[in-house]
């Protein structure tokens, strides 16, 4: 990994460390959210299509989380970031690697995903390496601490681990090339 890629990740981790848990966007008792790798480390915005999709499928008593990870008001999530496919791919590869092997990033996952433990129900739509992020979080969390009602829809998932908790409703959708 190049020096600039490493420094970008260090800057990203410093931003994650500085975020206040009190500013989490995961405050509702029932949440619907996207979780994916990050194609842009400075912004956690969803595309207008992703946000519209969530709003269209959102059950009446659920709240849409209008951000990707880290799901925090203090992290930019409203500005649309334009990223080339090549740069997005490189960023997602970096994210995947750090999810598995960077203990500081794994601690950030715990810190920023742990508000889900307070939710009555969560529906998480994992795109790409989002399933890898989720399985890493759940492994570090321990099965005895699993959120009560967790539903996962994995779209074109990329994950080192298989999500096989009996208490999780899982739907995997993948194309012939996934």
Feature roles, as predicted:
Residues 6-16, 54, 90, 127, ...:
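Intrinsically disordered, low-complexity regions
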Residues 2-12, 18-119:
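Active-site catalytic motif of lipid deacylating hydrolases and related acyltransferases
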Residues 104-178:
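Serine-dependent carboxylesterase/thioesterase catalytic core
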């Amino acid at each position: 990994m190049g020096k600039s890629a490493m420094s970008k990740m260090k800057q990203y981790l410093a931003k994650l460390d500085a975020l206040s848990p009190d500013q989490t966007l995961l405050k509702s008792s029932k949440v619907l959210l996207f979780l994916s790798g990050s194609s842009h480390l400075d912004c956690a915005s969803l595309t207008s299509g992703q946000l519209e999709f969530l709003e269209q499928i959102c059950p009446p008593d659920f709240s849409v989380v209008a951000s990707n990870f880290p799901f925090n008001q203090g992290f930019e999530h409203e500005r649309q970031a334009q990223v080339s496919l090549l740069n997005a791919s490189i960023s997602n590869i970096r994210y995947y690697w750090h999810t598995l092997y960077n203990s500081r990033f794994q601690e950030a996952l715990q810190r920023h995903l742990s508000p889900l433990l307070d939710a009555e129900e969560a529906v998480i739509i994992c795109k790409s390496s989002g399933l890898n992020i989720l399985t890493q979080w759940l492994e570090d969390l321990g099965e005895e601490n699993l959120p009560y009602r967790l539903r996962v829809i994995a779209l074109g998932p990329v994950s080192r681990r298989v999500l096989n908790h009996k208490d999780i409703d899982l739907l995997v959708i993948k194309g012939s090339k996934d």
